[in-house]
Amino acid sequence: MNSLREWEEAFEQAVDVKKSYDLAKRMEEPKTNPVLGYRTAGSKAEWETGELLLKEMQEMGLQNVQKDKIKVDSWDFHHAVLRYRDKEGKEYEFQLGAYQTDFHTEGFQEFSMVYLGRGTAENYENIDVKGKLVLIDINQREEWWINFPVYQAHLKGAAALIAVQDQGYGEIHDTSLNAQDIAGPKEAAAFSISQADAAILKEDMGNMEKTGNYTGDFKEIQVLFDAQSTVVRDRESYNITGMIPGE
């Protein structure tokens, strides 16, 4: 081949784009959350996808295809659903995202929810959050990572923290959900909610501006919450590798 373009054309002719696309779509089928997806480390969905790729690698002719066992802190997020009836009697059901923490309600349970601005120590002054859901705003790009307000809520006795992205990540649309890594004890439960859904909840709480400054009497709302998020340490997973024949 005498030119880069000739090499590019030969490469394009050899690559089966449709097969790659179809495989990627098949990889979307195993999921831990039937509504949102998720295929996380150590989960049944990850194992099923790994077996799919193992078979594909063998069938396409890769050599020395093997599974190397590893231990991971696994996370299996099945669902997090929040129901709320507003002051006008309208009922809502919100799908929440989650972070890698452990929380099980075993069906819908009633919780009090409070909105605490940025979730700083100052925001908690004179407020009892024991056993409650704490809603906060967060900008993970320019302020702090999710584990800081989550651990603060955990130390204060909150049942779980629910974060809504306020600038930073998760800004592609007001209905988007954020999912990123977290560092902390698995019992410090954390979930994410979209800006659009959070706005409905905040409208009825009305006790704080987004800055966290009080604007009136403190107010809680009652919600129903059903969540299943499971973290298990030292679960088996696999790295799957194969070698392309040739030199």
Language-model features: locations:
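Solvent-exposed loop/turn segments at secondary-structure junctions
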Residues: P34, K71-S74, T120-A121, N139-E143, ...
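Structural recognition of the beta-strand scaffold that forms the well-ordered cores
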Residues: L23-E28, Q66-K67, M113-Y115, K132-D137, ...
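Short alpha-helical segments and helix-capping/turn motifs at coil-helix boundaries
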Residues: G50, H78, A121-E122, E142-Y151, ...
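Soluble metallo-hydrolase cores and metallopeptidase-like ectodomains found primarily
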Residues: F94-N126, Q180-E247
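A conserved hydrophobic secondary-structure block that centers on an alpha-helix together
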Residues: G119-G170
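BRCT (BRCA1 C-terminal) domain core and associated BRCT-interaction motifs
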Residues: S74-L82, I162-D181
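Noncatalytic luminal/extracellular "stalk/propeptide" segments of secretory-pathway proteins
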Residues: Q13-K18, D22-K25, E29-L133, Q140
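Extracytoplasmic/secreted envelope proteins and their assembly/folding machinery
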Residues: E8, V17-A24, W47-L54, I146-V150, ...
